[in-house]
């Protein structure tokens, strides 16, 4: 074969081979390795207590100051200041579904606790909407009351002996029970099953201390808000959440694959938190709570928000210290 023909055949063969080679891919390379999502901002693993936390016990922790009779001629410095200001500053949060959360349609804060605050405003100003809301984490509640950056806290706040050393409380306006929330089919049925499991609780709550007392081998992940606990449970970064059944019901209402399990770990009586030096405001708030117990308002608020917990058993009875 002539040299020219050989050269032409070689060039043609090379061109065909190049043409048959797969083209270089221009698609981006995808990293298929799995990375666990980060914990929410402010989350941490609580240090295990070196000794079992003591029970919080004292005589009649839920007893409060009796409402003043109508027309009582006594100094009311806090109430005078509030009426002059024309607004009531209320500490609560936006992550407690059913109790205080933002309505997705209106953007307004709504819920059982919000309605309790509105009734206090109604009696104080003749208007249920004279409220300024301050968003607090559970760990910020006591300090906010002590430095008077809020007038009251209505935020699923359990009345305890230790907290009574720092602030005053109204009478009980709701009675909850601490329980456990898990993913259906998890195999966890009680607090005993939380041994060596990861459990979410919010920093600064009674739930955290009680969980460490009844199940010290659990690893407790603390977060700023209960809505953060819902996220880490859904992402399987924890095995359970433990707090008041009322809060757990609000979380479970957002995810059909969650369930509340086990018996009550402890009663959780909610009270309105008030500065220690505001005795007249304590008595006033207790007057409002007496009214809504007797005129049916409490039951109407319950039926608006909390029927997921079952039919209303009626408002908690008031206990007074004087």
Segments predicted by a language model, with ranges:
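Short loop->beta-strand "edge-of-pocket" segments that line small-molecule binding or catalytic clefts
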Residues: 89-92, 110, 191-207
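Periplasmic-binding protein-like
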Residues: 174-182, 249-288, 308-322
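Extracytoplasmic small-molecule ligand-binding "clamshell" domains
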Residues: 31-153
């Amino acid at each position: 074969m002539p040299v020219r023909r050989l050269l032409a055949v070689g060039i043609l063969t090379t061109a065909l081979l190049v043409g048959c080679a797969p083209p270089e891919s221009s698609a981006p390379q995808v990293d298929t390795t799995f990375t666990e999502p980060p914990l929410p901002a402010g989350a941490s693993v609580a240090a295990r207590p070196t000794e079992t936390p003591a029970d919080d016990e004292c005589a009649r922790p839920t007893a409060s100051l009796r409402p003043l009779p109508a027309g009582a001629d006594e100094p009311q410095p806090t109430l005078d200041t509030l009426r002059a200001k024309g607004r009531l500053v209320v500490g609560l949060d936006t992550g407690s579904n059913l109790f205080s959360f933002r309505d997705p349609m209106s953007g307004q804060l709504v819920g059982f606790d919000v309605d309790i605050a509105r009734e206090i405003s109604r009696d104080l100003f003749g208007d249920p909407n004279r409220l300024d809301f301050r968003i607090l984490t559970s760990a910020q509640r006591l300090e906010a009351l002590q430095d008077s950056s809020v007038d009251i806290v209505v935020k699923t706040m359990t009345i305890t002996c230790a907290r009574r050393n720092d602030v005053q409380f109204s009478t009980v306006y709701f009675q909850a029970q601490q329980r456990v929330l898990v993913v259906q089919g998890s195999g966890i049925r009680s607090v005993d099953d939380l041994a060596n499991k990861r459990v979410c609780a919010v920093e600064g709550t009674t739930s955290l201390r009680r969980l460490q007392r009844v199940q010290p081998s659990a690893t407790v992940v603390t977060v700023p808000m209960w809505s953060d606990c819902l996220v880490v449970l859904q992402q399987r970064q924890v095995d359970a959440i433990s707090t008041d059944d009322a809060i757990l019901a609000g979380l479970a209402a957002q995810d059909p694959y969650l369930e509340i399990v086990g018996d009550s770990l402890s009663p959780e009586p909610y009270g309105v938190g008030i500065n220690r030096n505001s005795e007249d405001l304590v008595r006033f708030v207790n007057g409002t709570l007496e009214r809504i117990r007797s005129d049916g308002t409490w039951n109407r608020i319950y039926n608006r928000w909390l029927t997921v917990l079952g039919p209303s058993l009626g408002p908690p009875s008031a206990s007074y210290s004087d």
